Amino acid sequence: MKRTTLAAIALAVTAGLGMTGCAGAAGPAEPQAQEGKTRLTVSVWNYEGTPEFKALFDGYEAANPKVDIEPVDILADDYPQKVTTMLAGGDTTDVLTMKNVIDYSRYASNGQLQEINSVVDTLDKDNLAGLDAFNVDGKYFAAPYRQDFWLLYYNKDLLKAAGVEDPADLTWDEYAALAKKLTTTGADGKAVYGTYHHVWRSVIQAIAAAQNDGDQIGGDYGFFEDQYNTALDLQKSGATLDFGTAKSQKTSYRTMFETGQAAMMPMGTWYIAGILQAKKDGKTNVNWGLAPMPQKKSGGDVTTFGSPTAFAVNKNAAHSEEAKKFIEWAAGEEGAKVISKIGVVPALQNDAVTDAYFTLDGLPTDDLSKKAFTPDKTALEMPVSDKSAATDKILNQEHDLIMVGERSVADGITEMGKRVKSEVLGK
């Protein structure tokens, strides 16, 4: 398997889009498959830090020795923009990883993906979590291979040192109080935060929508208010790193948790594979556990949010049939077993796959961590709609303004509604 960075395909995209570069200059030669093999290209992000890709590609190559998979590696933060640019330029990468349903909706509505109903029909649809998110008027343009949802990571040693119990069945008020209690100064004089909220809007908006049955495309966002107030209060009290610093310094949530700078952290299940690998490589010794996401009220069902990750076939794929075969394998039981072994939650959930997951070395096995894996409801992070991408852009912009204090919560929520209604919904 050879890995290609985006630079290795930049010449072709440049020719199509007129990007910066000298006309007629020779770009890097694309790696070729070994003689007699098909070279299948797959777009990915942060290949070295996202172990599921290597696991899937190695597994597929072992099962299909006449195929060489070449990852097209893109920086995680640049991924949506770069894939959009590639597609607009007629790039022929075979398989495109759909990082979220927002991007999927845009690519599908733009006619940039191939319909793969023939692949989906071969899958165990009843047990394939997240599949409905890719249904566009009865047509599927991608199939999910993993299904992530959000829960609460916590540092067991930091909680023990503070003399507090593990964070079971927390309400948001209890979570905020606990975060403040856990905030302290480390031996090196640096702050140890009670929690860490990453800069993504979903940390506030998606969980608010999930727990209030809110519609993020509807244009009325009063249900965001309590969640923003909680987040800003934590920031003001110093119980979490302030948003402006995290944004400007491009703070890594992994670094915050793995170096003991944060005692708790709401984050998706995708991080499990990353932290297991970091511990295996000796990059962290954090003693970690999992808990359900905090809830509005205690004693009720656990509601969280999540999003499937999927593979799609580029409309201009160089090897369409092989791309479809790869997706069928990755979204099926063999692909699910492969990623389960490294701590990734697969979209396919049956007894064989689940058993394989919970035998994983290093996965917390305490009752609270196991409970975190069985939320009662997992809402979709963002509705699938042709309006999702435009709405997401507005919500992101206004989210940033609220979090850095340039708008009050009330004014920010009002502005979100006005802009979505006028710019997206045409009201």
Where does each model-flagged region fall?
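Short, solvent-exposed loop/beta-turn-alpha elements that line the ligand-binding surface or hinge
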Residues: 115-127, 168, 185-188, 193, ...
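Short, well-ordered beta-strand elements
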Residues: 35-47, 67-72, 94-95, 141, ...
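Extracytoplasmic/periplasmic substrate-binding proteins
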Residues: 229-319
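Short, low-complexity disordered leader/linker segments with a strong preference
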Residues: 1-40, 62, 421-427
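Helix-loop-helix "hinge/cap" segment bordering the ligand-binding cleft or interdomain interface
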Residues: 62, 68, 135-202, 214-248, ...
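Long, aromatic- and glycine/proline-rich binding clefts that accommodate carbohydrate-like moieties
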Residues: 132-134, 341-393
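Hinge/lid segment of periplasmic solute-binding proteins
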Residues: 99-149, 289-291
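Conserved C-terminal helix/tail region of periplasmic/extracytoplasmic solute-binding proteins
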Residues: 160-161, 374-427
